[in-house]
Each structure stands twice: as structure tokens, then as C-alpha cells.
């Protein structure tokens, strides 16, 4: 009986709001 969050993806996996602008810097 494993309770893995497969149906609901962890919000942590999503990039933060400051992630998109950071890419521009790269």
C-alpha cells in the first residue's frame, strides 16, 4: 500500500515565479 502522489504532482516540482526571469539572465 504505497501512497505515492502520482495523481497529484508535488507543487515543489513546479518552478518558482522567479525561475522564468532567471533563465533570461543565463
From Swiss-Prot:
UniProt similarity note: Belongs to the cathelicidin family.
Subcellular location per the Swiss-Prot or TrEMBL entry: Secreted
Tissue specificity field: Leukocytes.
Keywords: Amidation, Antibiotic, Antimicrobial, Cytolysis, Hemolysis, Secreted
Name listed for the protein in its UniProt record: Cathelicidin-3.4
Role of this protein: Has potent antibacterial activity against the Gram-negative bacteria E.coli and P.aeruginosa. Less active against the Gram-positive bacteria S.aureus and L.monocytogenes. Has low hemolytic activity towards human red blood cells.
Coiled coil (UniProt feature): none
Gene Ontology CC entries for this record: extracellular region
Biological process annotations from GO: defense response to bacterium; killing of cells of another organism
Location of Leucine amide modifications: 26
Organism annotation: Capra hircus
Amino acid at each position: 500500500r504505497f501512497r505515492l502522489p502520482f495523481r497529484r504532482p508535488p507543487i515543489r516540482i513546479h518552478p518558482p515565479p522567479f525561475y522564468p526571469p532567471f533563465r533570461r539572465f543565463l
